[in-house]
Amino acid sequence: MNFQELILRLHNFWGQQGCIIQQPYDVEKGAGTMNPATFLRALGPEPWKVAYVEPSRRPTDGRYGENPNRLQHYYQYQVILKPSPDNVIDLYLASLRDLGIEPEKHDIRLVEDNWESPTLGAWGLGWEIWLDGMEITQFTYFQQCGGFDCLPVSAEITYGIERIAMYIQNKESVFDIEWVDGISYADVHHQAEVDYSHYNFEAADVGALTSMFNICEEEAIRVAERQLVQPAYDYVLKCSHLFNLLDARGAISVTERTAYIGRVRNLARMVAREYLEQRKRLNYPLLKDEKLRKQLIIEEEVL
């Protein structure tokens, strides 16, 4: 099974489970969790089921295309099930079977690993899922996003699709993964890994990045104050990525790092609060249980 087929199999499987198949979000981010289809939709009472591929950028992880397992740009396959179904682990194992991995024939372990994103003010109870000694998935029950409680709790499944592809194809290097017949992962991404590693570690202009961070922070605040949730969140993502670039350039001290994280977290909380207010004003249109919807609206009016 090539890399492209793997993604299509996951799309098909989760689509059959009732998930919306969304497309990647068009702003740089460090993880699929940061896509608004997860970060924002995990908030509030409305149900939500979504699956998508998310290109993820982590500038400090670049290795100039020389490390077979470490990349500054890679893919995650993200699934959100809200509220979390009782059979979520069974669904995950069924998805592995659909990829040709029979759980009964392998050593599959859940290793406790609670997840936290300080910049997003988000955390959850979770586990790494290991396949024959290699981590392939992160499973999380969201507890908070943007500092607000997630009620109902969402289940997040984040597949490391390069690792799964390496396992299925019996490859030792991510760059040897067959994307499609005759085209490898290296053909698609290797030169970009080299170029971005040079940029992230050597060429990025620290002064310009610092100025851009300040500008994006100001714009996030200004736009959020106008209750424009999605545009404001875009600037939160930009701030997060700019912080990661500055970190890769070695331009942030330990003290400054804490301050930068706090600044991004405050922005994320501000946008999360505006999102919750926006959905309330819209009377929770995705909440199909009319009785529950009216009850929530009445309770919030009392508060």
Swiss-Prot record:
Catalytic activity: tRNA(Gly) + glycine + ATP = glycyl-tRNA(Gly) + AMP + diphosphate
Database matches in Gene3D superfamilies: Bira Bifunctional Protein, Domain 2, Class II aaRS and biotin synthetases, domain 2
UniProtKB keywords: Aminoacyl-tRNA synthetase, ATP-binding, Cytoplasm, Ligase, Nucleotide-binding, Protein biosynthesis
Location(s) in or outside the cell: Cytoplasm
Alphabetized PROSITE patterns for the sequence: AA_TRNA_LIGASE_II_GLYAB
EC number annotated for this UniProt entry: 6.1.1.14
Top-level lineage group: Bacteria
One GO BP: glycyl-tRNA aminoacylation
Enzyme class, first EC level, given as a word: ligase
Any one Gene Ontology molecular-function term assigned to this protein's record: glycine-tRNA ligase activity
A cellular component term, taken from the record's GO annotations: cytosol
Family: Belongs to the class-II aminoacyl-tRNA synthetase family.
HAMAP family named among the record's database cross-references: Gly_tRNA_synth_alpha
Protein name as catalogued: Glycine--tRNA ligase alpha subunit
Annotated source species: Syntrophomonas wolfei subsp. wolfei (strain DSM 2245B / Goettingen)
Encoding gene per record: glyQ
